């Protein structure tokens, strides 16, 4: 409506060839890439068996890596490229029994830090947004609220703000890091969790 070109397609990020094709075709259709946002999850949640770890590696880690690495040549040409990966607060804070989920997501942090330091001379930034519990209709927390109300209440009670986040609050953080407003921010894990974490940094 405002003269902005948009392209879209369904793609399985666990399918390496399909993801690489999607990124390349999107860049071609748009005439390049200035921003790449990776919001990938195999929804491992509470699984701890080897199959869960393998799925997390294929989808969450390789899905992120393949997307970022494929986008890099376009971002380098941009002159002000930005990568934003949506992670989770579970990567920096003990998340109870979700060992596979936390471990897999934690692996993204040093990868993005490495990208940030190596790409800085090429004017490409890389950052992570780490959301806490986010509530939206049809989401996992709505399901937990209905089926496990005590767990839902306990999660709310743990957060000093007394509520869960909203999708738009995560989107705002992503937009900030992707934009020129964050032009001197790179290699940063931005936690968006309502003062939930106990870490000093």
PLM features: residue spans?
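Substrate-binding pocket helix/loop in short-chain dehydrogenase/reductase
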Residues: 44-57, 155
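Active-site helix of classical SDR
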Residues: 68, 104, 112
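Alpha-helical segment proximal to the catalytic Tyr-Lys
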Residues: 73, 117-121, 183
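Short, small/polar-rich loop/turn modules that mediate ligand/substrate recognition or access, typified
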Residues: 80, 120, 125, 185-187
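Residue(s) in the substrate-gating loop at a strand-loop-helix junction
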Residues: 88
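Short C-terminal tail/terminal secondary-structure segment
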Residues: 93, 174-175, 186-201
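A glycine/serine/threonine-rich, flexible loop-to-helix segment
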Residues: 121, 134-158, 199-201
């Amino acid at each position: 409506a405002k003269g902005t070109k948009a392209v879209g397609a369904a793609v399985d990020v666990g399918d390496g060839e399909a993801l690489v094709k999607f990124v390349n075709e999107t860049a071609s259709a748009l005439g390049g890439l200035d921003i790449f946002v990776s919001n990938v999850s195999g929804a491992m949640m509470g699984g701890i068996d080897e199959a869960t770890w393998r799925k997390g590696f294929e989808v969450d880690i390789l899905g992120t890596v393949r997307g970022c690495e494929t986008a890099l040549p376009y971002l380098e040409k941009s002159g002000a490229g930005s990568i934003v990966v949506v992670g989770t607060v579970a990567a920096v804070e003990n998340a109870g029994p979700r060992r596979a989920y936390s471990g897999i997501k934690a692996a993204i942090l040093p990868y993005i830090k490495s990208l940030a330091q190596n790409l800085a001379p090429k004017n490409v930034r890389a950052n992570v947004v780490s959301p806490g519990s986010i509530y939206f209709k049809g989401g996992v927390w709505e399901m937990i609220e209905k089926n496990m109300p005590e767990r839902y209440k306990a999660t709310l009670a743990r957060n000093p703000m007394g509520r869960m986040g909203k999708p738009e609050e995560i989107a705002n953080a992503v937009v900030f890091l992707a934009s020129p407003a964050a032009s001197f921010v790179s290699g940063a894990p931005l936690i968006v969790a309502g003062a939930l974490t106990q870490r000093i940094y």
